[in-house]
């Protein structure tokens, strides 16, 4: 992929293929999420992995202009990039604070995830509770006493659904575990990812949409969002085919009648999956 543009920009004639990001659709998706959660719940915008490939700096700046005051990233480096464009927002780093990173966390006013009892850095922290995901977090059965020890330091406490898009029963089991473990903590609590938006009782103090912000519906129950990214190119050549003629590797397409086909200057190196052959 050669370039990325906002939807209202236009690439030069020398650009072969590009993506366009619609900020208007990001705003529409954000509004759909806000309608679902109501005014008493905040949005923590997940902008990890370069905002899922949509451009973290552009997306974070735009979301801040839309009133979003909390963000989450996977790494410290991502968080520092986001901090440059949202100087007054809260930023949670999911991978936590490694030894020696404390000065950078404090210098950029970042919040570190804590997911092990023995790793509590001297920075702003949110504790992750393992309510059933089994990946990271203090086990929910042990979380109560641990949170009590850190009560005066906590900026928040959170958990992560394992299968909110498919397994309703297990998701409710996780929510029950999380609520029990965090009762009375006195700080913000959040567990709902994009798929978790389907559970009103999981909205709590904040929700953490990622895919939904970018218009990827995580499940049929959360389908009121629209894709933000469009991949575009120019037609390289138009070709006329007769019935029975083939085109492409392995002759994957054979014309059943006369056809006019467009050849596009896009290939595997641009990210086009070979599995899409004859399925576009």
Regions found by a protein language model. Name each.
Residues 2-31, 35, 42, 78, ...:
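Active-site anion/phosphate-binding pocket segments in diverse small-molecule metabolic enzymes
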């Amino acid at each position: 992929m050669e370039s990325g543009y906002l939807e209202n920009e236009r690439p030069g004639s020398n650009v072969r293929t590009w993506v366009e990001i619609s900020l208007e659709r990001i705003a529409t998706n954000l509004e759909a999420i806000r309608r679902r959660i109501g005014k008493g719940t905040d949005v923590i915008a997940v902008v990890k992995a370069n905002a899922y490939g949509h451009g973290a700096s552009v997306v974070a700046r735009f979301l801040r202009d839309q009133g979003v005051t909390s963000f989450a990233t996977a790494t410290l480096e991502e968080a520092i990039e986001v901090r440059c464009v949202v100087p007054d927002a809260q930023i949670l780093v999911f991978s936590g604070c490694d030894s020696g990173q404390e000065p950078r966390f404090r210098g950029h006013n970042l919040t570190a995830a804590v997911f092990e009892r023995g790793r509590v850095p001297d920075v702003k922290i949110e504790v992750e509770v393992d309510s059933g995901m089994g990946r990271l977090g203090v086990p929910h059965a042990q979380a109560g006493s641990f949170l009590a020890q850190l009560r005066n330091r906590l900026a928040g406490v959170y958990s992560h659904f394992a299968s909110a898009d498919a397994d309703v029963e297990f998701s409710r089991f996780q929510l029950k575990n999380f609520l029990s473990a965090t009762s009375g903590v006195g700080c913000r609590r959040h567990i709902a990812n994009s798929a978790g938006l389907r559970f009103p009782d999981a909205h709590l103090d904040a929700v953490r949409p990622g895919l939904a912000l970018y218009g990827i519906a995580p499940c049929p129950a959360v389908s009121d969002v629209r894709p933000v990214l469009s991949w575009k190119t120019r037609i390289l050549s138009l070709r006329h085919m007769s019935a029975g003629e083939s085109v492409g590797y392995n002759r994957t397409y054979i014309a059943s009648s006369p056809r006019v086909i467009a050849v596009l200057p896009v290939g595997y190196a641009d990210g086009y999956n070979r599995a899409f052959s004859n399925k576009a």
